[in-house]
């Protein structure tokens, strides 16, 4: 998902915390005894209002010794539960349903669990009238809000395929994950309605399972990135907007085909059946739902969604969607990757100079943060409020760590490792050590120190450089000192100077020994330098201060 300002994050946290704080404090780990492999959800969406009626059919594999399946479901009335077609007793608690499962012999036993439920949704499926008074319905599940309308194991570690069977007013369009299988007209009394069936055949986490039901106009790009999707297919892409916004298309979406081409070549095949971009009621700047990205409504009405946001959400189709963080503390594998690959799109589209400017802006954002970066590590195992993970650590610092990792191992090893990481964990889950394994294998380096200092410690290095010109020696003497606020870090630091003749001189300093004091370096210079710069290529996350002695 995308945030563009810290204020947006604070606003979202304030808006949502009341709804999920009680549940965020009690986030259960993955249920090791059960694996939901498929959801089939039939849902009836009303003309107006928030009351739905739905039936969910879950294919559940028992992988351990448990005999009670616990599904997350808030708010709604459960009318009945079946297991393998037979009605069973169940225990309804405020946030869960406990379903006893009959004993079956054998390993990896499969059950078909049916849940009939109804009621007024309060979150997860956002039901509201738009600015023109038209009722719209958009799934908006991150991080664990699917439980407000989908009986599920609402945790990123449990991925499944999903079929949506949505019955809605005939005046509305329905878009969901995956491929459209069919539509047909149905009659409810005298009212004409339409049933839409969508199927996502790749396993995705529940927080990415969504529907859109709204008056939508389609702008079709046709087939893009041909040969670069799974099975060497093309990627059908469309933008869906409110009808009155259709004339503004393609606008900032004009290059979505090129984005998919770039990311496919850098990472691996596009993972889904299509890619839809939708104007929606998501509470985030953008939400990366698998194959159906939802963008905030307001930018469509105020000049267009920023291209950087589109690139960020598109990159999520590989990182976060196809490869999902197994545990929430590793959410940087989603948000940090999307941040950095959006910057790589900038590089491909606008060149190295603009890319460096963007990375410098990302670094400034990190250094200006006073909430998360100075106090918490990127991999934050102590944070219990999931929304608080939407911070500068997960996004900007995570992205900049990838930038430094690329410099550490080199381009070839970096992208080879990214491709193997994606290939091994596509349609599954990963944690940070899975990425480290691939980086070490491709680079032939031990990177434990790198991952520990940048991801498991708060802060960043703070370096002060003082310099003077030695005229008799025709050299510049530079003293480099690390600050003590966050402790000493290990990194190479490039010192660049331009002498009076306009000649550029560079020296790379190993700052490992700076933990014990000051590092001194001498750089030849024919005359007094006109500038002395640290990290001219914007390759290092650090606060850098240069003064002349």
Predicted regions and their residues:
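A surface-exposed beta-strand-loop module
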Residues: 68-69, 73-133, 188-191, 197, ...
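Beta-strand-rich binding/interaction modules
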Residues: 77-84, 175, 447-448, 462-463, ...
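Surface-exposed beta-strand/loop patches in extracellular or lumenal glycoproteins
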Residues: 53-75, 162-169, 433, 483-496
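Acidic/His/Gly-enriched intrinsically disordered linker/tail segments
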Residues: 201, 335-404, 408-409, 425-426
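Amphipathic alpha-helical substructures
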Residues: 349, 391-478, 500
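Glycine/proline-rich low-complexity spacer/linker segments in large multi-domain proteins
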Residues: 29-31, 116-163, 214-222, 538-549
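N-terminal, polar/Ser/Thr-rich
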Residues: 12, 16, 20-53, 132-136, ...
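Hydrophobic helix-coil surface modules that form long, contiguous segments used
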Residues: 54, 141-142, 152-311, 340-343
